[in-house]
Amino acid sequence: MIKRVHLGQGKAEEILNLPNLIEIQLNSYEKFLQLERLKNNKPLLNEGLESVFRDVFPMKSSNGEVALEYEKYYIEYDSISFTEKECKRKGQSYEAVLKIRLNLQFLTTGEIRQKDVYMGTIPLMTDRGTFIVNGAERVIVSQIHRSPGVVFYKEKDLYYARIIPYRGSWLEFEIDSKKDYLYVKIDRKKRILVTLFLRALGLDTREKIIETFYKIRKIEVNDDTKREITGQYLATNITIKENMTYRAGDKITLQDIEDFLQNGVKEINLIDFDGYDSVPGKHFISSDVILNCFEKEDAYFALKDGFKELSRESVMLAVYSVLLPGEPISIDNAENDLRTVFFSEKRYDLGHVGRYKLSKKFGLDDLTTSVLTMTDIVNTISHLLRIYDGHDVLDDIDHLGNRRVRSVGELLTNIYKGAMSRVEKIAKDRMSNKEVFNLKPQELISVKPVVSAVKEFFATSQLSQFMDQVNPLAELTHKRRLNALGPGGLSRDRAGFEVRDVHYTHYGRMCPIETPEGPNIGLIVSLATYSKVNDYGFLETPYRKVIDGKVTDDIEYLSAIDEEKKCIAQANASVSSDGNYTDDLVSVRISGDYTTMMPKNIDYMDVSPRQLISVSSALIPFLEHNDANRALMGSNMQRQAVPLLFPQPPIVGTGMERIVAKDSGVVIKAKRPGRVVLATNKKIVIKPDNATSERDLDEYELYKYERTNQDTSFNHSVLVKNGQIVNKDEIIADGPATRYGELALGNNLLVGFIPWNGFNYEDAILISERIVKEDLYTSIHIKEFSIEVRETKLGPEKVTADIPNVSGKILSKLDENGIVRIGTYVKPGDILIGKVTPKSEGDITPEFKLLTSIFGEKAKDVKNNSLKVPHGTEGTVIDVQRITKDDVGNLPPGVDEILKVYIAKKRKLKEGDKMAGRHGNKGVVAKILPVEDMPYLADGTPLDICLNPLGVPSRMNIGQLMESQLGLAGKYLGEYYDVPVFESATNECIQEKLKKAGFNETSKAVLYDGYTGEPFENEVMVGVIYMLKLHHLVDDKMHARSTGPYSLVSQQPLGGKAQFGGQRLGEMEVWALEAYGAAHTLQELLTVKSDDMSGRVKIYENIVKGIPTNVSGIPESFNVLMQELRGLGFDLSIYDDNGNQIPLTEKEEELINKT
């Protein structure tokens, strides 16, 4: 194991250790399936799958005679047919059978029939946080979406309040600030006045509405108060005569006051606009918007008589016709329908998150009601009006308090909920339709909807992704990814700048650096190192509690909502050993503002400087000296590093390397402490200290050269010897891209920042032949090729070495069964599996028929359908798999067996391969120079790599220079360093190390030209830099074609390597040749060399016969154009110079020949 020297400004030990980096996956799935509780026979909590079944059951028949009750569910572990390794080999899913125990109760007789009902299979999560579906490892990415709850925002001149449920109809209120009216919309349909909506929900009079929203004050009516009352609004109705009522909400005129006095009205109730804040716990308003809506109502219903109240019928009809169109049956039904939209648990669910957000916003204690209440609607309207009046502030939609994370468990719960609601519908139908008393529980439950929904989710959902398995870091990052796309999320095209941007609440929760460059920027992000997801789905980050200016070791996890307005100090603030701040003023942040505060005003302190960035970014040493754009590229490119045969851990690391290797699941850790009794390259056996018997041994199977999802090699190498004592969790075997239990993505190289004869112009890289000879960047790539042996209508296909019309030389690589031998080196076009398919009679040529009639036997009636090595692939066959029906039990219909061949290729570094450092400094290898020609140091040491110094200043990634300097010192002192991000080694510290290693403190040295032996004019910056080989290899991109497939319609060559395509002579190339006046060259290129079908054949014949040729017909694209014009209704014909019609189709040719 490597001993690292800590070279940071902070302490070596952390206040809080990092959590398990894939716990977001493991915890979420455990919450969903509760496997631990099932194993230990503990009662299950009402969450995840259990909550789905509890919601659906009990089911009752419509006549109330029969009830189907749920007792429990369990997983049948005996039903797991294959291990994880076998599933990958055989293309199966790693899953178990799910059963539920149901009781069918006959309420009339009291009889109960119990049965365990099969509910399909459920994929199980591996301990690495992945699923194996159809032989491929997949990851369910967590989704970040708009949180249910209430949100207030403004767009243009409109103020909005939106209540978003977890399931159900959206309710939206909007104030049009130009007209001062408040409207309501349900599910973004047509808007209606809010007063009509309130009336429909039960506040059916003006008085009730005013009483709900406004503070009311009593005032005496006399000559002294006349002036004060004039222009005010009535809060209650006043009836003077039988037919004369002054309505609540009407404006009082002087004439009205005279009427009051004449009719003996002594006291009236007025709306008190100024007293909106005077009653604690009441959210009264000071706006007249609701009163304007009353006026608008009058206009809407054309009430000529100003003293009438609206009838219930007219209100219900008006609301129902807009919100729930289609003629209602009756007023009562209309009212009922409207109420069920928001107040029925079947149709509406705020979710515990939505209820929590509503209660938090309006200061309520209720955390249990899952539907909307009248109080919620009133509070929302009041709050919106208070915002409109400037008494409250708008919400920030991009605040992480308004966005939450849905992980695997919740996504699966929703899938099961949807499927079970269909199951419920079918069961209820069957309960009412069948002869009830002959029923068994399993006959009521249809399992099809559940099976298909789960299958569809894992196979096709946008959030179920093929795992990025290039290296352990890519794997880990993929499991920690947050995606704003997917079902119920945003779409790339509609997502604006604000959603993608970094927000202050991302601090410690989401990484501001790691995100893709391109259309997904800011929509796909990564979890920060210490971040966790709480029970409500909000992201939390840990802080140390500060009490009376003293820092404690108490850790509190805060969500973005809890953190608002708290004063938080940075992790690198100077603190004495007793927990007191050493400075009088400490740098702090409060919400999005940065300032300084006295220690006594501080609430919390960051746990670690690396808490605000993701795992990939935390692996970049001297991150704070890099420009953010380059840090982003550095984070992303580390994930593309190919695992090498002989990697080295970086001399300059950040302390995260060991943690990443451990949590990624690619290394093997000891489960219990003990002694190694066997260590081979296939398995390790450890006898634990607390073994209960001689046979109680821990066995660990090692993967040897297995293929990953991205065709890289997954290989374990043993780190322990026989007899060695190991501790619990000690790393006993390295995986791909790890060395001594640390992440090792590349190698340490001696670098000079020097231009060299133009070979490293524009980010190109010059490397020494030593790197290639010593296999420093050699990687193994494994490709899988498979073929199905099918049952055809004419008989079965056969795997055989007896293939018609194939030379013995080609067949020499196959064994007697027609399968390539393991260890054979194969090249493009070689046969891997010999397979023959029966021919139909129609395929037989006249010559064959002649032979058959002469010899009286069927000449070979099969055709060659063998699996061949595709273009651009060569390598050694390392494994062949035969999968038959006996092995797996369920092959696709019509398939007898599947054969898979694995070909491994050792790829050395070559010109055209892409390399990169950890600071976004990427380039392509332009030349591999013999060692003797490389520039060398005064002691004769040649450089390994030359990088262009012009790649540094404009890119502003100075981190690479500091890394090179410290790496140089480390190499010569034989030390490895930990340089944690945001508290890196200082310049002074680096210079000290360089001096100790015997170098100039600038790390500049005199270099000598390898060609001439002369020193270069100036000193050159020399160092040791950590370089990676990326998964963009020239071998995968190189492509050549002479002839190949053509597009069916245009008869032009296909494009791209995958289709074995060619190059297209496009519009611009034609212009270039036209500009030269190269008419004959152009004609040849546009006809016989391209898509003139008859010309192509003719020119080939002429070349074979050796005749000089000058043929050119009509290009096929011209025919396509003609047919398109005909399709538009133009009758077109074409004629040659002599006026003869040229046929475009065979049918035309026949017609012309006839005439």
UniProtKB/Swiss-Prot annotation:
GO BP term, pick one: DNA-templated transcription
Keyword Transcription assigned: yes
Catalysed reactions listed for this entry: RNA(n) + a ribonucleoside 5'-triphosphate = RNA(n+1) + diphosphate
Class in the EC hierarchy, top level: transferase
EC number(s) stated in the UniProt entry for this protein: 2.7.7.6
PROSITE patterns documented for this protein: RNA_POL_BETA (PS01166)
Pfam family, any one: RNA_pol_Rpb2_1
Single GO cellular component term: DNA-directed RNA polymerase complex
Origin: domain of life: Bacteria
InterPro entries: DNA-dir_RNA_pol_bsu_ext_1_sf (IPR042107), DNA-dir_RNA_pol_bsu_external_1 (IPR019462), DNA-dir_RNA_pol_su2 (IPR015712), DNA-dir_RNAP_su2_dom (IPR007120), DNA-dir_RNAP_su2_hyb_sf (IPR037033), RNA_pol_bsu_bac (IPR010243), RNA_pol_bsu_CS (IPR007121), RNA_pol_bsu_protrusion (IPR007644)
Gene3D superfamilies per UniProt: 2.40.50.100, 2.40.50.150, 3.90.1100.10, DNA-directed RNA polymerase, beta subunit, external 1 domain, DNA-directed RNA polymerase, subunit 2, domain 6, RNA polymerase alpha subunit dimerisation domain, RNA polymerase Rpb2, domain 2
Described purpose of this protein according to its UniProt entry: DNA-dependent RNA polymerase catalyzes the transcription of DNA into RNA using the four ribonucleoside triphosphates as substrates.
Family named by the database record: Belongs to the RNA polymerase beta chain family.
Record text on subunit structure and interactions: The RNAP catalytic core consists of 2 alpha, 1 beta, 1 beta' and 1 omega subunit. When a sigma factor is associated with the core the holoenzyme is formed, which can initiate transcription.
PANTHER family named among the record's database cross-references: DNA-DIRECTED RNA POLYMERASE I SUBUNIT 2
Protein name in the entry: DNA-directed RNA polymerase subunit beta
Organism (species): Borrelia duttonii (strain Ly)
